[in-house]
Amino acid sequence: MARLNEQAMSSVALSTDNLELLRRKFLRQNRDIARVNSTQSLRIRGLENECARLLSENLELRGQVLRLEKELQDNAARRVADHALEVKAKMETQLAELSSLLASLGEPPSKRRLSEERRYAQPRPSVHRSPPLRRARQEADQELLAEQEGRLPPIYENKTYARATMNSEEILALCMQADDSNDSPDIGPPPVSRFVEDDMVIPCSPSPNKNAEAEETETTEQVEESPRALQVPPSLSPPKLDYDRRPNMILFSPPKESRVAEPSKMFSPPPMEPPKQSTSAVPSETIRAGLKRKLNGDNQNEPNKATKLQQGKENGNETGIKKGLSARDPHKRKSIKETATKPRAPLSAKSTNEHIVSPKKPAKPHQVADDFKPVKVHKASKGKEKVDLPAPDKKSAVEETQGNSTSAFTKVEILPPALEPTPEVAEIPETDILITPGTPERASESTVVTHDTPPPAHISSNGETSRPSRRARAAISYTEPNLRDKMRRPTKELFDAVSGEGKFLHRPTSQQQQQQRKGDESAPTSVSKVKVEPSPAVDISSLTSSALFEKEKEKEPQPDEGILSPNGILPSSVDLGRRRRASSFSTAAPAMTIPSVQEQSTLNLPAADETDENAAVEAQIQKELSNSITTRPRGGKGRQSMSRSVPTIPTENYEHEDAQLSTNSASVDLYDFASCASPDSAAPQLEATTGDVPVNKKAPKGSRRASSAASTETTATASAKPRSSRKRASMLVPKKSLWAEELAQEEEDEEDVGNDSGGSLSKGRASRRRSMML
């Protein structure tokens, strides 16, 4: 045992030694590994530093490469620029040589002095010019030469001296003349030439002047429609220089010294000379072909040329004015200044076509003398007013305008076509275009104008744009007859547009409506209190005593039955009494009750024997109804239907009740608002009969059947009638619950009335009848 223990102890000691050795070995290895790691980490750090250094060197090298490349490019560009500069310098030297060669080309011969050569060779600056007086003289000479040779004068630029044309006052005077002139402001005056002296005009060929005179008298009115008249007014156009295009006139311009005094001379009015009228035969002269303002060759008034001119000579001053305006030779031109209302302003426009007036719409109709009006115009006028002034007024107007000729700024005014002699108007061939029966005033106004080209047909002289009809017709009013006038009748009744007035409708007649209106006017309209006051009943015994009434009792009324029978007798469905307003039907108060079937049936009984028979029948009906009445609380489960029948009541009585119900329901016009009485008039309905019956009492079975039959008949008749009220049918038809309660109350009343004497029965019926009539 002891050896065994020793061996165990020895094995334990060996194991502990081995573990110690292993621990030391591991520690030594760990130290080696840590040393290797440290050396490796140091080496890694060194390599990283080397990489960073190499990268920085690489960047530096790249920057250097880029810098060198840029230097190369700059060197290349510099070389190109240097070459261009060299070429430029060479070209400048060559251009200098060429300019010297060109400068030597314009030199005068070498005989003259060098100073003169240099002075002429160098370009003269704009400052060193000739003095203004010498330049003005040269310009005046050049203008005079141009006028004599028929050329246009030269146009100078950059003038430093004052212009010799018009100042601001003259321009303002021209503007005022343009406003006061008879020319149209839209089209403008005819073309003019300025600075034309009457004394400087020398006629070269007298025969064209005569031809021009005859030609211009013909074309006095033709140029109004000419497109050449569309010129700018003189106030807007630039001032023109003094030249004239007429080849038959030789114009002279005064020298420069005389132009200074020219405005003062022009301000004074020219001397007036008496007009010289030509005595030669003007109609035989021909028209010159080369007229400046050429117009349409086809003159519509050519056959009347000779007669117009002859009549113009006979008229004295007026013809002299017109001839003075149309003359062209210098002797005839003197008459222009006489006939002008004002002397011409200095340097103002002098028209070459002085006889032409631009088209302008007249402010008022032309005044034509009564002596020279055409006969057809008088026939066409037919009583219309026309403003006619005699011929002496025109002469006085011309004299007034001549009296005003001493104003400062004047112009040659051309007389309007309204002041022309009127014998020409009478000889115009009257056509359908000028004179029509429907347009008398326009015909007389249009005959004054003697255009070669007439104005458009759709525009008259007064600016009207439509031609009226040939015949004067009366004005047609489309507002009458009105629909209200078509539908109006002798009375104020309204008829149904669908069914028509010829069909018999359930409406009260005009007499009934008058009675109802009288009752409505007398009755108050307040609904404050319900009073029991009997009102006088209408006696309908005379209407219900016939045989027709018996037939009406047996059958139900049809909805299309007429108001009057063929014999002229009112049927039983007509109620002549006053009816209650619809508001009394719609209220649910127990005091407002509708008369029962028995009360309504008593209204139609005419005689005493018939009332006794019906009283016996009603007593029997009331007894059987009272036996079958079963009351039930209002909140019960099973409510009996309104159409449930009672087997104890005989069918004859039901038929009689249905007939009476239908007749009375048909007599009530549900849609007649005017026929309904006020609640005060409908109030007396025997409140004593309603006091015994509780409000929430169940209606009897028999009364339910009767009320259902009555309601169906009422709705049937109401659907066939036209509406003439503002109330709806559902508001006017009596409610079924009200019918049931009222029937139950009336049945109890009938039992009480049956026990009374015959006199009390008749009194109660009479009072019920009165209440029903209300």
Swiss-Prot record:
Residues 706-722 have a biased composition (Low complexity). Residues 765-774 have a biased composition (Basic residues). One of its GO terms (cellular component) is nucleus. Residues 106-151, 205-661, 676-774 are annotated as: Disordered. It is found in: Nucleus; Chromosome, Centromere. Residues 109-120, 382-398, 482-495, 549-558 have a biased composition (Basic and acidic residues). It comes from the Eukaryota. Keywords: Cell cycle, Cell division, Centromere, Chromosome, Chromosome partition, Coiled coil, Nucleus. Residues 41-105 form a coiled coil. One of its GO terms (biological process) is chromatin organization. Residues 297-318, 399-409, 595-604, 640-651 have a biased composition (Polar residues). The keyword Transmembrane does not apply. Belongs to the shugoshin family. Plays a central role in chromosome cohesion during cell division by preventing premature dissociation of cohesin complex from centromeres after prophase, when most of cohesin complex dissociates from chromosomes arms. This is Shugoshin. It comes from Neurospora crassa (strain ATCC 24698 / 74-OR23-1A / CBS 708.71 / DSM 1257 / FGSC 987). The gene is sgo-1.
